[in-house]
């Protein structure tokens, strides 16, 4: 079985249902609030874990209750956790409004995800790894360093270019 390494975001999604998405300056009433383990990186790892893949997740969370819940979720879904904790920022969150047509509007607050810096990437993370999976909810310079290190080892790399942003062409080669 191939070994997969996901390096990316872990967020606590705070989801509410609304009749319609508010316009500028408008306040709308939400229907309930649901806390759901999320983050593009964690979602990728969990999906592969549910399928029985040998997957490891690396990212950063705070030292708060959301961090504990997110790490418990990874474990329950069969994902090996090598997530780092920091007291310098809270765990990342996403504020999500879902309207009656099931269209959503999302605001992501990076929190600890934004503290995963290029100089923190360890060559040992890539030992015995067959596939690296990334997305863009961690700093772009960190993504570039991860791609560089994976490429140097000829590791197949998957980049989910979301949230959308301009990417240097060299990053995609």
Describe every region a protein language model picked out:
Residues 73-88:
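A glycine-rich helix N-cap at a beta->alpha junction
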Residues 86, 96-131, 136:
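Conserved phosphate-binding/catalytic loop of the ribokinase/pfkB sugar-kinase fold
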Residues 1-60, 67-69:
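Glycine-rich phosphate/adenosyl-contacting loop at the front of the ribokinase-like
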Residues 78, 111-119, 157-164:
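Short gly/ser/thr-rich secondary-structure transition/capping motifs
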Residues 131-173:
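Conserved beta-alpha-beta core of the PfkB/ribokinase-like small-molecule kinase fold
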Residues 65-77, 96-98, 102, 122:
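Active-site-proximal loop->helix
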